[in-house]
Every structure is written in structure tokens, then in C-alpha cells.
Amino acid sequence: MYSPDTTKYLIHLNLQAEGVVEKPDVVGAIFGQTEGLLGEDLDLRDLQRTGRVGRIDVQISSKRGETKGDILISSSLDRAETAILAASLETIDRVGPCVAHVVVEGIEDIRVTKRRKIVDRAKELLLDHFEDGSIDSYELLDEVREAIRVEKIGSLGDEKIPAGPNVMDSDAIIIVEGRADVINLLKYGIKNAVAVEGTNVPAQIVDLADKKTATAFLDGDRGGELILRELLQVADIDYVAFSPRGKSVEDMARKEIIKALRNKVPVEYVRDQFYGDVPGEKRTQDLRPQKPGASEQNSIKKENVENENESTPTSFEPISEPAPPVTLHDHMERVSGHLIARFLSPEFTILNETRADDVEMAIDQMTTEVSGLVIDRVVDQKLLDRLVGKGVEFVAARDFNGIIKRPLSIRLMKIAQ
């Protein structure tokens, strides 16, 4: 018995008969006129009996004394045998009592047709039924590398504080909020981060901050400000860096992390905002990354520090040819004492510089995105309200007076005098 699943080829024949004939006449003519023509191996009846040739499908119609139509025969023979069988059918010259002509119109390779359907269907499945996300070798490598970095996260003390592998050996540490922040910094090769995991700062972090150069790297939201306030009360923090508004440290990309850490500011510039002056304590503006003799320097009077800075200028002080400012701290130093104001871009380039007394007019004329304002004058509530809605993320000023309602979207920093 013939199975349609084994069909390889489909023979298409065209029939024209000079008279009216029926389907049985056509089938009888095919079997009768091909019998014994090709030998026993290619006898059409035997081929049908063994299932190598399918049923003969005849579609004809009679009109005006003529019969026309198509004949379809499926075959599972090889190409040569199928071609011979098709050619033999063209020898049919009569159907019933009528003269007839049979012509092979084509031999269709069913497998090619199936392959074409498979390709078309595969395209549909690929576009519509696969989940989003292609396999990327770089993503696979990043996942493996991140897993290795996660395994490298250590824990300090009995409190199991999450920390990078180089926290104890490094001369400087970066204090972040949680374990996810440490993992993200590890992802980009920063191995000296340690997490406070809440506002209750562990004693071991306090001890590390006393011995090493400590940078607080926190989210720029309310939670980050509360943690910084706690750190300023219990730990010796040297520098402060914040993530961009609306983004946490754990979500920052490598370029954003490097930029934020590069633009960290000494703690003196934010101390008044988050903690206020500590009675009886004077902190120097030593910007060196090392902290030898820090306790002795804290007791030096401001006048002596200024004399020392004049004799041995640090890398931040302008010399004969001042370098262009590259950090927020540089702009603070350049503006201090000059009664000017600078509008800065997100990359800390100068968008506009004007007299400090004319800053209100400059704000009204702003046409480009401004990330921050550094100004050598006292900022009051009225000036601060003008900056709301302008996209300004921070204001560094000589002082702040009469600030009753501080905008959550603007970070305030005091320029150390």
C-alpha cells in the first residue's frame, strides 16, 4: 500500500481528448497502454501494488465536444525511474474511443517543496516564538567573570561585613551602602570596597577609616545622605562621592563609576550640610591620598596650613600656567575668593562664567543643560528656588543662608574658605 509520506516526486500531466470521456476511461487508458511497455520492474500495476507509485488523480472537464484536464501521479521511485515512467505516459494516444494527447508539464520534487515550507515556517518561528535575547559570547564571558568576582567577596569580622579582597591590604578604602554595590565595583576591577549595610556603621569600618584614606561612595538619594550623616559622626572620612541622581551605585556602569570617584570632593565641602562643625575640631584641607600623622594635622591652625600650602603647593593648586579644571574640587578652588560663578556641564566643563552678583540673570538666560553651579557668594532660598526645574544637580557656594526648604533634587556643598 502506498504511503503519502514516502512521496519523492509528483508527475504533472496535461490531457486533451477529441471527444467526451470520463475518469475511468482515462485511468483504463493509462494502465492498458503502458502495460508491458517498460518491463516487469516498471509495470505501473506492480508499482502501485508494491506502494512505489501512488493513486492516479484525474481532474477533467468536457466542453464543446472536447475533454481537457490534468493528471497527477505521485512516485517514490528515484529520479531516473520517475522520468522514464513520466515519458511512458506520453505514449497514450487514445482514451476510450477518442483520440487523446498526453504531455508531461513537469515533475515536482516534493522534498524541495517541503524544504521551502520548512524554511518559511522556521522564519516565522524564529521571529514570533523565541524569547527575546540572543546568545552572545561576550555576555557569557561577563556572567562567568562576574560569578568569579562574587566568589572573591570576603567578609570582615564577626558581623560578616561584605568587602572586596584588597580591603585589608590597600592604603585606601571605598565605603559603599550594600553588598550589591561591592559586587558592582568588583565587576569593574575595584577590589577595595566595603559595605556598611545600613545606618549602623560597624566598628571595624570605623577602625579602617581611621587607618586608611576613606572615600564614602553612596547613592544620591535620602538613604545615601542618612548613611553619610552617620559616617561623619563616627568615622574619619576623607572624601565623598555620590552616584548620579536617580541611579544607585549597584546600577552604575564602569565609566560612570570612574567619573564619580574621580570627582570626589574632600569631606570639608559637605560636612556642614550633613553634620555641621564639630565643636573644638579644626580639619585641614590636606588632599593627599595618604594619611600619615592625620591626628597631628587636625590640630594645626588654619594660618599654618596656608603657609605650608604656599611653600609646598599640592597638585590641585595652580602654578604659573594653570591647567584647565577637571574636577569639581578644581572649580571650587578657582572660584573661591574671586566673586565669580561657574555653570558646569555633567563632564565638569565650564558652560558659562559670570560675576557672582549677576548669576540670577544668567539663570534666566540658560539654554543648555547645566549640571551644577559653583559660586563665590552666599546662596539664599530665593536663588535656590530659581535653580529648581533647571536640571541642576548640585550647588557649591561660599555659604548658605536662610534655606528653609532645601530641594531634594539639588545637593548643597559649602566651599571651604
From Swiss-Prot:
Do you know which SMART domains this protein is assigned to?
TOPRIM
Q: Which residues form the Toprim domain?
A: 171-257
Pfam families tied to this protein = Toprim_4
Q: Which GO terms describe its biological process?
A: DNA replication, synthesis of primer
Q: Might you report a single GO cellular component term?
A: primosome complex
Q: What EC class does the entry list? A: transferase
Please list the cofactors this protein needs.
Answer: Mg(2+)
Keywords of this entry: DNA replication, DNA-directed RNA polymerase, Magnesium, Metal-binding, Nucleotidyltransferase, Primosome, Transcription, Transferase
Binding sites annotated in the UniProt record for Mg(2+) 1: 177, 219
Q: Which GO terms describe its molecular function?
A: DNA-directed RNA polymerase activity; metal ion binding; poly(A) binding
- From start to end residue, where is composition biased (Basic and acidic residues)? 279-289
Q: Which catalysed reactions does the entry list for this protein?
A: ssDNA + n NTP = ssDNA/pppN(pN)n-1 hybrid + (n-1) diphosphate
Q: Where is this region: Disordered?
A: 278-325
Enzyme Commission no: 2.7.7.101
Which parts of the sequence bind Mg(2+) 2?
A: 219, 221
Q: Where is the signal peptide?
A: none
Task: Please give the InterPro entries that the UniProt record associates with this protein.
Answer: DnaG_primase, Primase_DnaG_arc, TOPRIM_DnaG/twinkle, TOPRIM_dom
List membrane-spanning regions: none
The record's comment on cofactor binding reads:
Binds two Mg(2+) per subunit.
Record function comment: RNA polymerase that catalyzes the synthesis of short RNA molecules used as primers for DNA polymerase during DNA replication.
Q: How does it assemble?
A: Forms a ternary complex with MCM helicase and DNA.
Q: Which family does it belong to?
A: Belongs to the archaeal DnaG primase family.
- Name recorded for this polypeptide: DNA primase DnaG
This protein's species is: Methanosphaerula palustris (strain ATCC BAA-1556 / DSM 19958 / E1-9c)
Q: Which gene encodes it?
A: dnaG
